[in-house]
Regions:
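Long amphipathic alpha-helical segments used for membrane anchoring, targeting, substrate engagement
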Residues: 1-30, 81-101
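Residue-level signature of catalytic and energy-coupling elements of molecular machines
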Residues: 12, 46, 71
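N-terminal intrinsically disordered, cationic/polar leader segments
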Residues: 28-52, 59
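Short acidic, glycine/proline-rich loop/turn micro-motifs
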Residues: 53-54, 64
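A short, polar/charged loop-to-alpha-helix boundary motif
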Residues: 59-68
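Stable alpha-helical structural segments in soluble proteins, enriched in small hydrophobic residues
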Residues: 70, 74-85
């Protein structure tokens, strides 16, 4: 019985170390959201790293509202990519914990 608990503790520590490493990797990863003229880059914490707007001389002030909408779409696109990658990379740890309970 004692060996099983020790093995479980070792496995839990190993899983915790792997989880922490994966979380650190995700935080360092950049995700780019794109919407027509807008590119937004977020890190794994969903902090905005950069915003790039591609406009030319024909851009008019009336287009500002549309540009704001495109920024929002690009941000949401990048945020979805962060969530999907986190789910993909961290989901396996949640599945492993379910077997221990």
């Amino acid at each position: 019985m004692n060996m099983n608990i020790q093995n479980l503790m070792r496995e839990a520590q190993k899983m915790q170390k792997n989880l922490q490493k994966t979380q650190e990797e995700l935080e360092k990863t950049n995700y780019e959201g794109v919407s027509s003229l807008i590119n937004i880059t977020l890190n794994g914490n969903k902090d905005v790293v950069s915003v790039k707007i591609k406009v030319d001389d024909s851009f008019e002030k009336e287009d500002l509202e549309m540009l704001e909408d495109m920024i929002l779409v690009a941000f949401k696109d990048a945020a979805k990519k962060v969530d999907a990658d986190k789910e993909k990379k961290l989901g396996k740890y949640g599945q492993g914990l379910a077997g221990l309970m």
